[in-house]
Amino acid sequence: TPEYQTKDTDILAAFRVTPQPGVPPEEAGAAVAAESSTGTWTTVWTDGLTSLDRYKGRCYDIEPLPGEESQFIAYVAYPLDLFEEGSVTNLFTSIVGNVFGFKALRALRLEDLRIPPAYSKTFQGPPHGIQVERDKLNKYGRPLLGCTIKPKLGLSAKNYGRAVYECLRGGLDFTKDDENVNSQPFMRWRDRFVFCAEAIYKAQAETGEIKGHYLNATAGTCEEMMKRAIFARELGVPIIMHDYLTGGFTANTSLAHYCRDNGLLLHIHRAMHAVIDRQKIHGMHFRVLAKALRMSGGDHIHAGTVVGKLEGERDITLGFVDLLRDDFIEKDRSRGIYFTQDWVSMPGVLPVASGGIHVWHMPALTEIFGDDSVLQFGGGTLGHPWGNAPGAVANRVALEACVQARNEGRDLAREGNE
């Protein structure tokens, strides 16, 4: 229905559609709109008992992709009433639930969603957000530093705590449980929580700075997850963590509500994201998963590194980094942003750069991500030839040097590692 005027309250979706040979774009686009809203495979008499005009998804625009004759972008508008308030789970079940297995399509990818304020306002969003986090930690004007404790699996709780202490003592703000550290036979969660809390308090006392360790509360059941979160709060630690895709949006949103009520920061890891977002023609782009997380709730989320990747990737990555941090993001196709997104007053999420980065990337990282980010060096800290603490010191010194140079007006991108 090309004559349809989108409403401010509609949820808009941009799909990259690859139809089967012989299926016209209009038909494929309409099929996507119907299957992800009110349609079924045949006309049913109960359709007469409701006003389909009011409730059906509409494909309102189709645009060809330059250089791809078999693909195009289909824009679909969904009426707000199709979705349960405050449920990312329901949003995804509706929009991407069934339609991706559709016979008439060879492949389908959800590139972007426009979430109207009327819908985003039904979510709590991040437990605290960027500003409140800085106030809690008393750290301003620079990116935060983190480090994932390696080897990720196999350390005893006592040795794990020791590694945490050394990194924090050396000058990092945070250390992190790996995403797959939950509660395994060699290190049960309660032992880990206790030893990490000890490490945090010792490092805080010795450095006079607030420290944290992302205690991974992800578990096999929601009840067990909450039990871990509650234990972390009782220990008085500042931050916990969750794997939001493997744990699920329902669990994540519950945890985010608990974190706001109890003053815990929530670090989010995106384990499993590549299963969904890796393919260029099928699945969902990470910017959609990032928007969903901002609604569901998290104070940090992993967002890739940019460094060492292609230049084109940089704009796309910064596009969804801004979607996480800013209140208002203009439509900009060169950055992969298909819709203008207005978050109104929903708190922002700190993007976490993590994975294969080390101290020589520091100038590039501070220049690309700016102050509102968490830079995480795992092997880049623990792999230091002299040990964890000197590795942490090296990272902190490099960061402070880069920030100082930038504040003095030097161009980090040009001067690089000198």
From Swiss-Prot:
EC number annotated for this UniProt entry: 4.1.1.39
Primary location recorded for the protein, binned into one broad class: plastid
Molecular function GO labels: magnesium ion binding; monooxygenase activity; ribulose-bisphosphate carboxylase activity
Keyword Plastid: yes
Co-factor requirement: Mg(2+)
InterPro entries: RuBisCO (IPR033966), RuBisCo_large_chain_AS (IPR020878), RuBisCO_lsu_C (IPR000685), RuBisCO_lsu_C_sf (IPR036376), RuBisCO_lsu_fd_N (IPR017443), RuBisCO_lsu_N_sf (IPR036422), RuBisCO_lsuI (IPR020888)
Domain of life: Eukaryota
Binding site for Mg(2+): 176, 178-179
Complexes and interactors: Heterohexadecamer of 8 large chains and 8 small chains; disulfide-linked. The disulfide link is formed within the large subunit homodimers.
Protein name as it appears in the record: Ribulose bisphosphate carboxylase large chain
Organism: Pinus virginiana (Virginia pine)
Biological classification of the source: Eukaryota, Viridiplantae, Streptophyta, Embryophyta, Tracheophyta
Gene: rbcL
